[in-house]
Amino acid sequence: MKARKASAALADLFLVLFLSMSQAADADIIEIPSGAALFGGTGGPLIVAGDPNGIPPDSPDNRVDPNTPTSPFSGVVSINIRFVEGGVAESFLCSGTLVASRYVVTAAHCLDVDGTGKLVDITQTGNDVRVAFNAGALGEPGRVNITASAVSMNPNFEGFGVCAFPESFLCINDDIAVITLGQDAPVEAKTYRVFSGDVTTGQLITMVGYGVSGNGVTGYDFVNYDADFHIKRSGQNVLDVFDRDDEKNFALASPQENWFADFDGLGKDLFCTTLGVCTQVLANDKEAMIGPGDSGGAAFLFNGSEYFLMGDLTFERFGDPRGSFGSGMGGNLFSAYIDYLEGATGGVIETVSAIGTVPEPGTCTLMLIGLGLAGAATRRRGKLRKVKL
């Protein structure tokens, strides 16, 4: 009963929103227009910087990756999903990560055409999925767009927020998909080994994606720092709490499937205030938040020499203003989905269960698991809406 009550209390804590961004549907090249609106009520992708007047000061420009082959994030890609559904042409931007020369991992909701887990059919006229590599400057071999030859979705994914748990929770489990490239990725783009072990409260992660940015004081800035297929940003955070397998009623003995973190600054610490989970607040120029367009992006662990793909970025919890300090975020842990990933990639991905020393910036005060942390009533799902450009 205690776990069930905790889930109910958290129902109003988390509103998840799509991190994918709408884009002009008839574009022949992968470019996103400015002023894009995003999904409300379910989760959104991006890396938001700290306080512009903090110590040290920060800005979205400080978080931009150089897009070079030597960047540790050269294998983090942007994705353009285009399809016609109900006679309406749609186009979206998401992020993803290269795990083998022909395979990119992203979020399942990026490839879902109707919110029920219906996979985009790329054999139909007007439908395609294109992956943009940014491992070099324009005209260099590391910058290339590759069209997908196949797409796959975790079979347990039935739509964003749809939960296998027998009660009316809104959960974000199983949100993982694989894109098969029509040709090999450029050699300039890094491939990443997938972490298959457990994670704990207090561990440091690095998040990378192509979403909207902004700062922790004023939140998302869709005018000056909109999502862009060729601008990726990175930032760090600390793992706070986790959730278990919804197909197994979030039983404590079931695998961890979701991770949660919060965007701390100016005295605002979401999980410390609401749950008593008080992990370390990172430096102003390190702490980050995700946002619209980061969906499917990378959550890495770093052991001092190599980045390992721990999971994806899939949802946010609104701050006030949205994307500011006090917001929450999270994604899926790939350790729970190794069987799916190996099957979808023909077994060519490389997994590792132990990676040596991982920086742990804060002492964990509490680890909450099996609580249905993103749980919300059915009425929350009814509020999900897609805002077009």
Where are these regions (language model features)?
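Bacterial N-terminal signal peptides that target proteins for export
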Residues: 2-11
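A short, hydrophobic C-terminal helix/tail in secreted or cell-surface proteins
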Residues: 360-378
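Chymotrypsin/trypsin-fold serine protease catalytic domain
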Residues: 173-176, 182-287
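Bacterial N-terminal signal peptides
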Residues: 11-20
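C-terminal membrane-anchoring or membrane-association module
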Residues: 375-389
